[in-house]
């Protein structure tokens, strides 16, 4: 089942319908309630292993390739209904990373983030950093505020899968957002609520979204 071209789930206890994109209950006994967002990383297996080489894999039997492979590659297929939208800022099937707060939403074109490698921005009141340390690394997104202080970051040349803040020189792991050296060692960056999507799908839920430009 789809709602605004996004997946709809149901819970077995109440049969309430929940949207995947924003976690809201749209029909049923729990209508109006909202699921807590648990931040995650969307990555290929190769990218995932760069940050988490000791991962345990949960694998189930199934077809050897994605059932959506053809759909993902066809730029003219936009959702089940193929609905057209008036917003022409990006091609409908452009892959974006959407970041949202209660006050605002911003889309970042994934290939632009990868080209820049590190992007710092504000989404409403939320200062964020999006990082792709290399082509073989996933894009990870963190809140830049630590203990009430907003930090700025850069990627060092001497080590992979880390970033340094320019205020204290502390070094931070991209795997979990923890400071591993420097005066802030032990401090933790929180994951920012980021969602990978096609542009048309993100627009379906956030039609007034901002679009980050390089």
Name each region found by the language model.
Residues 1-214:
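Mid-to-C-terminal functional-domain signal that highlights helix-capping/loop sites
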